[in-house]
C-alpha cells in the first residue's frame, strides 16, 4: 500500500500515484483488475523485480475475431491472452512491426488495423512496466520543467553528490528489502525505504507533487471504482422499481406504494454516489470531468438521471426509466473498454467559457435519451389501456 502511494510522472506529464498506473496497466493490458489473487500494485511491483518471469505469463488480452494477430505471434487461435515474449522472435525482432506502419498511417483504419494498434499499445505499456522505464519517481533537482526520471535515466539528468548516490542505490536496496521481507515476513525496512523515497519526492518535487489529500482521494477512487459498479446497481434498482410501479398501477396497495418510494430513495442515493464520483474526478484531475470520451459518457448518464429525478413529480415511471437508461449509457462505456484514465487537460480545452459550453451541450443528450425511453414506456401503457383502467393509466 505504501509503495502505491509514491508519485510517478507519466508520459503525458501527469503526476499520479503508482497505484493509479498499476490499475491502468492491468485494465489496459489484460482487461482485468487483478491477477491470480494479486492486486495491481503487487503485480506491478513483481514485474519490476521478476521481469524474466512475467514475460512468459499470458497476460496481454487479444480481441476475439482477429486470428491474424494470433497467427503472427504463434499462439492458439482460441487463446484470449498472449505472453509478452511471443511478440518477439529469437533475434528480438518485433513481430507486429511490418504491419504497424500501414496501420498508423491509415487515415481511416479498418478493424484489423485498429486491433494491431491497440495490441501494440498494450505491448509498449507492458514493456514500460517490465523495464521500469515508467517508474519515474525521482524528481530532478532544480529542473525548470519539473522533470521526473526513472532509475534507468538516472545517469543523464544532473544528479550530483549524495543525491546521485541516493538515486543509484535506493531502488536496489528496496528490492533487496522486499526479498528479505518475503522470507522473514517483516516489512519494516522496506516501508522505511518507501518513506525515504517519499521524502526525496517532497524535497525536490514539491511544486508538482499532489497533496496528501489528493493522493488519498485518488487511491480511494481507484479502490472503490464506483462508476464501474453503478450501472449494475442502477439497472437492478430500475427493474425492480419498474415492476412495482406497474403492479401498483393495477393493484393499489399501501405496501406497494411504500416499496416504490423506497426504490425511489435508493435511486436517489445512487445518483448521489454518481455525483460524488464526478466531483472526485474533478478534484483529482483539477479540471471539469467532461474532457474525453469516457467522461462525456459518464456525464451524459449523470444528466439523464438528473433530469429523471427533476421531473418525477407526476410519475415514478420517470425515475425507473431514467435509472434504466443511465445504466445502459454507463454500460456502453465499459463494454467497449473506453479508456477511463484521468489525464491532463488538453491546452485547447483549457478555457472557462468552453468548459461551460461543453457542459451544456453534452448534458443536453440526457433529456433526449430520457424522452426516448419515456415515449416507449408511454406506448406500452397505451397498448394496455382499456375502459376499466383508463383513469389510472392517465395518471401515470
Language model features with spans:
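Soluble extramembrane regions of membrane proteins in the secretory/endomembrane system
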Residues: 1-220
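Residue-level marker of motif borders
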Residues: 7-8, 287, 352
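Short, glycine- and charge-enriched coil/turn segments that flank and shape catalytic ligand pockets
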Residues: 184-186, 250-256, 385-395
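Conserved hydrophobic/aromatic pocket- or pore-lining residues that grip, position, or stack substrates
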Residues: 197, 292, 357
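Core alpha-helical transmembrane segments of integral membrane proteins
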Residues: 210-336, 340-343
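Generic detector of multi-pass transmembrane helix bundles and their immediately adjacent loops
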Residues: 303-396
Amino acid at each position: 500500500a505504501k509503495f502505491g502511494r509514491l508519485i510517478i510522472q507519466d508520459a503525458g506529464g501527469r503526476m499520479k500515484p503508482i497505484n493509479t498506473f498499476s490499475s491502468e496497466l492491468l485494465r489496459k493490458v489484460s482487461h482485468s483488475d487483478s491477477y491470480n489473487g494479486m492486486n495491481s500494485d503487487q503485480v506491478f511491483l513483481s514485474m519490476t523485480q521478476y521481469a524474466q518471469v512475467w514475460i512468459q505469463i499470458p497476460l496481454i488480452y487479444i480481441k476475439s475475431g482477429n486470428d491474424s494477430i494470433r497467427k503472427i505471434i504463434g499462439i492458439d487461435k482460441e487463446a484470449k491472452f498472449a505472453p509478452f515474449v511471443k511478440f518477439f522472435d529469437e533475434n528480438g525482432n518485433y513481430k507486429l512491426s511490418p504491419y504497424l506502419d500501414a496501420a498508423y498511417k491509415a487515415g481511416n483504419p479498418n478493424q484489423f488495423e485498429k486491433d494491431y494498434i491497440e495490441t501494440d499499445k498494450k505491448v509498449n505499456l507492458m514493456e514500460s512496466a517490465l523495464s521500469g522505464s515508467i517508474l519515474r519517481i525521482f524528481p530532478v533537482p532544480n529542473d525548470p520543467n519539473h522533470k521526473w526520471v526513472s532509475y534507468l535515466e538516472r545517469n543523464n539528468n544532473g544528479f550530483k553528490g549524495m543525491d546521485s548516490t541516493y538515486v543509484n542505490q535506493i531502488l536496489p536496496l528496496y528490492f533487496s528489502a522486499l526479498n528479505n521481507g518475503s522470507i522473514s515476513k517483516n516489512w519494516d525496512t522496506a516501508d522505511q525505504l518507501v518513506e525515504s523515497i517519499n521524502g526525496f519526492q517532497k524535497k525536490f518535487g514539491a511544486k508538482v507533487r499532489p497533496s496528501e489529500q489528493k493522493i488519498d482521494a485518488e487511491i480511494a477512487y481507484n479502490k472503490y471504482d464506483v462508476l464501474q459498479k453503478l450501472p449494475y446497481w442502477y439497472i437492478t434498482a430500475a427493474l425492480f422499481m419498474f415492476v412495482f410501479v406497474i403492479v401498483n398501477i393495477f393493484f393499489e396497495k399501501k405496501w406497494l406504494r411504500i416499496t416504490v418510494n423506497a426504490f425511489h430513495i435508493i435511486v436517489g442515493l445512487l445518483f448521489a454516489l454518481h455525483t460524488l464520483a464526478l466531483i472526485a474526478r474533478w478534484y483529482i484531475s483539477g479540471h471539469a470531468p467532461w474532457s474525453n470520451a469516457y467522461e462525456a459518457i459518464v456525464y451524459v448518464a449523470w444528466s439523464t438521471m438528473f433530469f429523471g429525478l427533476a421531473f418525477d413529480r407526476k410519475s415514478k415511471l420517470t425515475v425507473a426509466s431514467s435509472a434504466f437508461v443511465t445504466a445502459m449509457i454507463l454500460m456502453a462505456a465499459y463494454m467497449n473498454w473506453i479508456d477511463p484514465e484521468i489525464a491532463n487537460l488538453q491546452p485547447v480545452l483549457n478555457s472557462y467559457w468552453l468548459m461551460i459550453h461543453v457542459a451544456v451541450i453534452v448534458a443536453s443528450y440526457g433529456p433526449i435519451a430520457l424522452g426516448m425511453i419515456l415515449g416507449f414506456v408511454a406506448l406500452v401503457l397505451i397498448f394496455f389501456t382499456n375502459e376499466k383502467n383508463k383513469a389510472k393509466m392517465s395518471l401515470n
